[in-house]
From Swiss-Prot:
Gene name as annotated: PA
Keywords, comma-separated and alphabetical: Decay of host mRNAs by virus, Eukaryotic host gene expression shutoff by virus, Host cytoplasm, Host gene expression shutoff by virus, Host mRNA suppression by virus, Host nucleus, Host-virus interaction
One MF annotation (Gene Ontology) recorded for this entry: RNA binding
Coarse class of the protein's main subcellular location: host cell
Official protein name in the record: Protein PA-X
Amino acid sequence: MEDFVRQCFNPMIVELAEKTMKEYGEDLKIETNKFAAICTHLEVCFMYSDFHFINEQGESIIVELGDPSALLKHRFEIIEGRDRTMAWTVVNSICNTTGAEKPKFLPDLYDYKENRFIEIGVTRREVHIYYLEKANKIKSEKTHIHIFSFTGEEMATKADYTLDEESRARIKTRLFTIRQEMASRGLWDSFVSPREEKRQLKKGLKSQEQCASLPTKVSRRTSPALKILEPMWMDSNRTATLRASCLKCPKK
């Protein structure tokens, strides 16, 4: 699983996942499924915010080609992927600037158009079950919840899906592709079932296959949301985007 993750996710996402696990004292060599889950969640958060901006009239627009105008503002603030101290600093800054209610738990994004924090969920189970778990944990109507599954299903607070259909389809396509790639390597069952994972760990099973290239529709896109995470994040003059190919498996 670790080899699969390193081959099929952008190096920046892998690095952020490694830092996250280290911060919580988790060993990615042992908890490889969690490593894969964190990378997947990070990718969905970045894809959620990709190409979405707010123009001078306060309207939400999509800019996919070239660099966006300096007059455009990023619609989403990415909180996920930061260390906890910096993440709470960003949340506090948003609350002080917008008047938003401070959440009890760290959310994943902030939507400047709808003026709300967003909790993103990616589940291997039924979306409604995971949604209820999230809602019971957060216990706040102020934080918007949006759940995606690896089967193409989704569920959101009050059926408000925030993004346009094409943007959501891009996320669903990527998740379905990850599922297919895992299944082709015999990794999916252990990823879904902790019991199966333990059984495979005891046997010392390890996938040796190389990751095949992803479908062109997904692999050729770039991810403007992969930015250097630093304190200047909240400034209007954001740090430069890391223009890396979005989560592309290397071709042999």
